[in-house]
Amino acid sequence: GEAVGRVVALGADVNPSLLGKKVIAAITIGSLASHVVANSELCIPLPDGMTAEEGASLSTAFLTALYGLNSLANLKPGETVLIHAAAGGVGQAALQVAKRSGAKILATASTPKQAALLKQGVEQVYDSRSIDFADQVLTYTEGRGVDVVVNSLKGEWVDASFRALANGGRFIE
């Protein structure tokens, strides 16, 4: 579940700057309590201008996308990101986070969902049911590959994703 609240106590290895801050937290149980314990790695600051109610309505999909693209991948404006299963919950959240970051967005999705993703501003959409996307990404990026892969696939699709990743690129899942 999700919770919004003010940090009132910290564990031993937690950044002290979080104390007193309002955060959105992903927690497994107990979000309807007056106090909860949350992993600091699964907390993000409540954005300026966002109410607690708005923050609490964000889904785990958005927290996953924010944490993955901002905290882990450190996505920068102008970088290219490949979002697998971009029509799904985490994929849609990642698409919005990446767009807000100013990244160039490539995606995979099933054929019936590809047109909708193009309307959302995705530059290229590839078939998620074929590993041909790796070669297509390399062609589109003129052999460079993407800076970030947001992965939700398995098996040979993971290997293909690594082939589509630029030198020094980041793979998150």
Show which residues each predicted segment covers.
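A glycine-/small-residue-rich N-terminal strand-loop-strand element
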Residues: 2-29, 47-49
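Short helix-loop-beta connector
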Residues: 18, 49-51, 74-80, 143-144
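Mid-domain Rossmann-like dinucleotide-binding core that forms the NAD(H)/NADP(H) cofactor-binding site
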Residues: 59-130
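Short amphipathic alpha-helix with an adjacent loop that forms part of the alpha/beta core around
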Residues: 132-144
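Periplasmic-binding protein-like
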Residues: 145-152, 172
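Helix-to-beta-strand junctions that scaffold the AdoMet/dcAdoMet cofactor pocket
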Residues: 165-166
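Glycine-centered, small-residue-biased loops immediately flanking beta-strands
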Residues: 169
